[in-house]
Amino acid sequence: MNYKVLERDARLGDYYSKKLLEERFAQSEALPIRDALGYSLTWCPCAVPSALLEDIDKMYRQISITGIDTEVSIEEESFHSCRIEGAATTQEELFNIFKAKRTESKGDKMILNTYRAVKYLNITKKRDESTLIQLWKIVTDGVCNNPGIAGEKFRSGVVTVGTHEAPEPELLEYCMLQFFQFYHGANISQPYIKAAILHFYFVYMHPFCDGNGRIARLLTTDFLIRSGLDNFSALTLSKTINETAPAYYQALENSENSFHDITSFIQYILKTVYDNLYEVLSNQNKHVVTYTDWEKIFP
């Protein structure tokens, strides 16, 4: 849902837009996590079809990772996550990067760093502020943009990404507290939805001067694995995000609205998981569900 367009049209007197906004507001529920100014994020549960979640569960149960090289999957996850951030390295060059440890370009280094970050998460049990700071150091080692606002822990300056102006640096401690209270809290029982909320919030607060997108994607997969969905260690969600990058950024932008409603981003992540699982199963010649383009169905 594009709130900016609807709110503009409602201000211009469009009855349909006004009515749609009123209905969406009435259907919204507060989430147990607040933005930098203390407003609760919201979502609209009725805009997330139960059939989508059921199909995801069906497909996940049929995934066989015995025929998937997990190491290669980690390499490809690192590659696609960095391609989203502008790395020019091609997939044909991955062999030289991982086998010969080639670091000729910034993109090469970004990919190797992201690979190292996955390995770090695999052996680290803690999920707290210190873990994120170490993760940031690994991801941006030798390739950090905006080092002038790196700060002692978090960024020390204001950051604007597209139309999003991240919270002021002095509000980041509060945001980080919100993030981990939600992360460790017994709140949203559906792991895919909770992973989407965590992903959005991390990108929203943008705690570091660089590497936030890569870290958010790492944390998404990591959270799913830690929720008992171990097969995601062999899947590459960033591949699907890379292939649908404009929709990824549009979903983030649509989730910046006066209602604090992040349903658009939750829908995007669920569709990403669905499409990724469907592709993997198709490659394994397994046809578990009839493909649905959920983008056309989401209200």
Locations of regions flagged by a protein language model:
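FIC/Doc superfamily catalytic core
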Residues: 1-299
